C-alpha cells in the first residue's frame, strides 16, 4: 500500500510502498480517507533533536485522520464494516494504576501512533478498537480528520470553568486558535490571543476572538485597559512553549488565576516563581486528550454550532503531500488536510 514514511535519519518524508497492516483480535482495520499534518509531523520531517531520540527509522508516520472500518478483529464488538471513525492516537497499556482507575490519558506506558508505532499516513491503518471513535453523520471528513489536535485544544480549554471569565491564550498556532474558539463558544467574557505571526492572528480573528494581539507591535497591558480589565486574566492557556509568552502570562494573571500548559518550553526555562507563589496561581500540565470524555465533547461542540472550518486553510491530494509540508513549515497556514481518496 501507499504510505508516507520516515525512511532516513535526515530531513524529509518519503512516499513508499509498504505491506498492509495485519489485524489483531482486538483491532480495527481502517481505510484512510483524510489525514491532517500535525506540528509533530513537521518535527519528524525536520529531524530535530526530539525526533532523533524518539522516532524509529524507517516508519510510517502521521496520527490525525478519518477513515472507514473495512476489517474487524474477532474479539471486537460495537463496530461494523463501513463505520466512519477517527481514533485516539495514544495507545495505553490498560494495566498501570492510572489505566485501571480510568485515567488512561495519564498512562505511564503510552505509545503514540505515528511516533512509536506505524501511523495513519497510509492507505490503511490498524488500531485497537478501544481507541476508535465513531464520527457522527453531521460532521464532515475534513473536520473529523483534525479531531486529534482539536482534542488537545478542548482538553486544555475546558480544564477550568470559563463562563464569564477573561481568558489569555498565548500562541496562535492551530491548536491555540481552536482553544480560543472553544473558550468563546462556552461563555468566556474576553478571549485574548497573542502571537507574533500576523497570518495566524488573522485566523484567530476569523474564529471570533475578542482581541488578537501581535505582541511585537502592541502592549498586552494596553489591550487589557482597552477591554476594561482591571484585575488580570482569570484563565491562561499556554500553547506556544515560548518563555517570553509564559512570563507575560504570569505577569498578567489575576490572583488565584489558573493556567493550563500544552506548549512545551525549553527544559531550562526560568520564570519568577514568586509570582506563582504570591499570586496563588494554579498550573496544570496537559498531554493529549482525556479518553474519551474529550472526544464526546469535541463532537458535541461542533454539533452545537462551533465552526472550525476557517482553521483548515490548505487541502491537497496525497500525491502533493510535499506542498502540504511546505505550507506547514512556512508558518503561513492553519491546518493542512491531505486526501487519500
Swiss-Prot record:
The pathway where this protein functions is: Amino-acid degradation; L-threonine degradation via oxydo-reductase pathway; glycine from L-threonine: step 1/2
Q: Which Pfam families match?
A: ADH_N (PF08240), ADH_zinc_N (PF00107)
Its lineage reads:
Bacteria, Pseudomonadati, Pseudomonadota, Gammaproteobacteria, Enterobacterales
Q: Name one GO biological process term.
A: L-threonine catabolic process to glycine
Instruction: Report quaternary structure and partners.
Output: Homotetramer.
- What EC identifiers does the entry list? 1.1.1.103
Q: Which reaction does it catalyse?
A: L-threonine + NAD(+) = (2S)-2-amino-3-oxobutanoate + NADH + H(+)
Q: What is this protein called?
A: L-threonine 3-dehydrogenase
List localization entries: Cytoplasm
Cofactor binding, note field? Binds 2 Zn(2+) ions per subunit.
The record's function comment reads:
Catalyzes the NAD(+)-dependent oxidation of L-threonine to 2-amino-3-ketobutyrate.
Q: What PANTHER family has UniProt attached to this entry?
A: L-THREONINE 3-DEHYDROGENASE (PTHR43401:SF2)
Indicate which residues the UniProt annotation says bind Zn(2+) 1: 38, 63-64
Summarize where NAD(+) binds, as residue positions.
Answer: 175, 195, 200, 262-264, 286-287
Family the entry assigns: Belongs to the zinc-containing alcohol dehydrogenase family.
Q: Which InterPro entries match?
A: ADH-like_C (IPR013149), ADH-like_N (IPR013154), ADH_Zn_CS (IPR002328), GroES-like_sf (IPR011032), L-Threonine_3-DHase (IPR004627), NAD(P)-bd_dom_sf (IPR036291), PKS_ER (IPR020843), Zn_alcohol_dh (IPR050129)
GO MF, one term, reads: zinc ion binding
* Needed cofactors: Zn(2+)
Site (Important for catalytic activity for the proton relay mechanism but does not participate directly in the coordination of zinc atom) found at 148
* Residue sites binding Zn(2+) 2 per the record: 93, 96, 99, 107
Active site at 40 (charge relay system), 43 (charge relay system)
Which Gene3D superfamilies does the record cross-reference, listed alphabetically? Medium-chain alcohol dehydrogenases, catalytic domain, NAD(P)-binding Rossmann-like Domain
- The domain of life for this entry's organism is Bacteria
- State the UniProt keywords alphabetically: Cytoplasm, Metal-binding, NAD, Oxidoreductase, Zinc
Amino acid at each position: 500500500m501507499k504510505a508516507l514514511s520516515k525512511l532516513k535519519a535526515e530531513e524529509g518524508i518519503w512516499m513508499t510502498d509498504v505491506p498492509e497492516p495485519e489485524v489483531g483480535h482486538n483491532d480495527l482495520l481502517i481505510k484512510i480517507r483524510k489525514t491532517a499534518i500535525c506540528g509533530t509531523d513537521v518535527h519528524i520531517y525536520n529531524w530535530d533533536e526530539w525526533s532523533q531520540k524518539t522516532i524509529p527509522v524507517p516508519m510510517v508516520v502521521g496520527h490525525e485522520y478519518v477513515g472507514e472500518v473495512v476489517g474487524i478483529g474477532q474479539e471486537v464488538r460495537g463496530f461494523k464494516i463501513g463505520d466512519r471513525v477517527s481514533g485516539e492516537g495514544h495507545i495505553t497499556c490498560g494495566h498501570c494504576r492510572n489505566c485501571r482507575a480510568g485515567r488512561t490519558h495519564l498512562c505511564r506506558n503510552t505509545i503514540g501512533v505515528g511516533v512509536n508505532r506505524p501511523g495513519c499516513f497510509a492507505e490503511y491503518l490498524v488500531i485497537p478498537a478501544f481507541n476508535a471513535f465513531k464520527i457522527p453523520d453531521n460532521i464532515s471528513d475534513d473536520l473529523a480528520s483534525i479531531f486529534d489536535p482539536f482534542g488537545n485544544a478542548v482538553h486544555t480549554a475546558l480544564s477550568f470553568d470559563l463562563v464569564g471569565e477573561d481568558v489569555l491564550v498565548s500562541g496562535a498556532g492551530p491548536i491555540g486558535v481552536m482553544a480560543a474558539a472553544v473558550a468563546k463558544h462556552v461563555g468566556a467574557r474576553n478571549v485574548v490571543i497573542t502571537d507574533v505571526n500576523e497570518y495566524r492572528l488573522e485566523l484567530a480573528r476569523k474564529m471570533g476572538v475578542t482581541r488578537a494581539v501581535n505582541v511585537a507591535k502592541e502592549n498586552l497591558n494596553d489591550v487589557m485597559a482597552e477591554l476594561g480589565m482591571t484585575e488580570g486574566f482569570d484563565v491562561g492557556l499556554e500553547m506556544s512553549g515560548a518563555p517570553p509568552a509564559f512570563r507575560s502570562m504570569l505577569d498578567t494573571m489575576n490572583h488565584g488565576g489558573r493556567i493550563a500548559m500544552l506548549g512545551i518550553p525549553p527544559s531550562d526555562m526560568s520564570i519568577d516563581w514568586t509570582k506563582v507563589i504570591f499570586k496563588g496561581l494554579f498550573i496544570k500540565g496537559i498531554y493529549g486528550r482525556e479518553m474519551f470524555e474529550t472526544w464526546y465533547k469535541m463532537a458535541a461542540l461542533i454539533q452545537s454550532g462551533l465552526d472550525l472550518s476557517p482553521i483548515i486553510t490548505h487541502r491537497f491530494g496525497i500525491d502533493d503531500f510535499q506542498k502540504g509540508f511546505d505550507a506547514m513549515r512556512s508558518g503561513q497556514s492553519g491546518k493542512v488536510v491531505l486526501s487519500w481518496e
